[in-house]
């Protein structure tokens, strides 16, 4: 197989361009590509969907390891290129916005693997979109900005811990696998990237409605520099005294800050909030 650097140069000489508006940075490092594919494909019979295939350098390798790959690409010009370059491989190319993709439309009630070098300008919306479809996924292996990767796997008490950390960890067990330097791409981004692998699962002992849970979490982080009592009062539109009673019932000090609470503590607060509102 033609190596990634030569493949990319050949296609770029043919007139293909990276569109900044779509956050396109093309991966050219074979070692990184192989590492992502190896982390993604544990069972060749499990279907794979790739988000943002770009020029297809990773898609080619995924298609050698998996029996079926769906590549989701918004850029119509890249779709035509992919159809030409990937001819003969077990790849279906979907010209659509990944934020509108329902995985059940691809593999029904089964589970598959999601892989992607996610466009940095819509990383969080994409992650949230697919985490909400956790029942359709066995795992995800995604490349994101290093700072986003750190947030995804952050633990309570650190500056990186926030809504995205909690959303990811409620739905999956995540691990940052390795970092990827800017020179692995063309054009080179201004930031270091990182690859994160998620094993999708239900959070052990999760006992509240996710809608209620995330309403409380978002309210708690709505004024990050303030105490939990003040943030929840403002975010939920409830009197400060009532919030104090709610937090006392949950066993949580109202002087703490949102970034110090574990998922289990947020569950306790959610339960207390909902009982108070009934």
From Swiss-Prot:
It is an enzyme of class 2 (transferase). GO terms for molecular function: 16S rRNA (adenine(1518)-N(6)/adenine(1519)-N(6))-dimethyltransferase activity; RNA binding. It catalyses: adenosine(1518)/adenosine(1519) in 16S rRNA + 4 S-adenosyl-L-methionine = N(6)-dimethyladenosine(1518)/N(6)-dimethyladenosine(1519) in 16S rRNA + 4 S-adenosyl-L-homocysteine + 4 H(+). Keywords: Cytoplasm, Methyltransferase, RNA-binding, rRNA processing, S-adenosyl-L-methionine, Transferase. It is found in: Cytoplasm. It comes from the Bacteria. InterPro entries: KsgA/Erm (IPR001737), rRNA_Ade_diMease-like_C (IPR023165), rRNA_Ade_Mease_Trfase_CS (IPR020596), rRNA_Ade_methylase_Trfase_N (IPR020598), rRNA_adenine_dimethylase (IPR011530), SAM-dependent_MTases_sf (IPR029063). SUPFAM superfamilies: S-adenosyl-L-methionine-dependent methyltransferases. S-adenosyl-L-methionine binds at residues 25, 27, 52, 73, 97, 117. Pfam families: RrnaAD (PF00398). CDD domains: AdoMet_MTases (cd02440). Its EC number is 2.1.1.182. One of its GO terms (cellular component) is cytosol. Transmembrane segments: none annotated. Gene3D superfamilies: Ribosomal RNA adenine dimethylase-like, domain 2 (1.10.8.100), Vaccinia Virus protein VP39 (3.40.50.150). Specifically dimethylates two adjacent adenosines (A1518 and A1519) in the loop of a conserved hairpin near the 3'-end of 16S rRNA in the 30S particle. May play a critical role in biogenesis of 30S subunits. PANTHER family: DIMETHYLADENOSINE TRANSFERASE (PTHR11727), DIMETHYLADENOSINE TRANSFERASE-RELATED (PTHR11727:SF7). NCBIfam families: ksgA (TIGR00755). Belongs to the class I-like SAM-binding methyltransferase superfamily. rRNA adenine N(6)-methyltransferase family. RsmA subfamily. This is Ribosomal RNA small subunit methyltransferase A. It comes from Desulfitobacterium hafniense (strain Y51). The lineage of its organism: Bacteria, Bacillati, Bacillota, Clostridia, Eubacteriales. The gene is rsmA.
């Amino acid at each position: 197989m033609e190596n990634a650097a030569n493949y990319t140069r050949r296609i770029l000489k043919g007139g293909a361009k990276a569109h900044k508006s779509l956050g396109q940075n093309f991966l050219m490092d074979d070692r990184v590509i192989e590492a992502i594919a190896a982390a993604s494909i544990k069972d060749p019979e499990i279907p794979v969907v790739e988000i943002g295939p770009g020029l297809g350098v990773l898609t080619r390798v995924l298609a050698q390891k998996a029996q079926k790959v769906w590549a989701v690409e918004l850029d119509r010009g890249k779709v035509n290129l992919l159809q030409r370059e990937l001819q003969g491989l077990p790849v279906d190319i979907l010209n659509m916005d990944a934020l509108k993709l329902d995985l059940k439309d691809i593999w029904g009630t089964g589970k598959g693997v999601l892989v992607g070098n996610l466009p940095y300008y819509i990383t969080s919306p994409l992650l949230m979109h697919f985490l909400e479809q956790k029942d359709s996924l066995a795992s995800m292996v995604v490349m994101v900005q290093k700072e986003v990767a750190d947030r995804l796997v952050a633990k309570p008490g650190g500056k990186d811990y926030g809504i995205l950390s909690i959303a990811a960890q409620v739905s999956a067990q995540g691990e940052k696998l390795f970092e990827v330097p800017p020179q692995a791409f063309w054009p080179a981004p201004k930031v270091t990237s990182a690859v994160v692998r998620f094993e999708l699962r239900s959070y052990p002992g999760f006992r509240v409605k996710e809608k209620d849970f995330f309403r409380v979490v978002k309210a708690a982080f709505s004024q990050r520099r303030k105490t939990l009592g003040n943030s929840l009062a403002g975010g939920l539109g409830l009197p400060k005294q009532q919030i104090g009673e709610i937090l006392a019932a949950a066993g949580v000090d109202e002087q703490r800050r949102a970034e110090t609470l574990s998922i289990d503590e947020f569950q306790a607060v959610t339960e207390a909030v909902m009982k108070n509102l009934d």
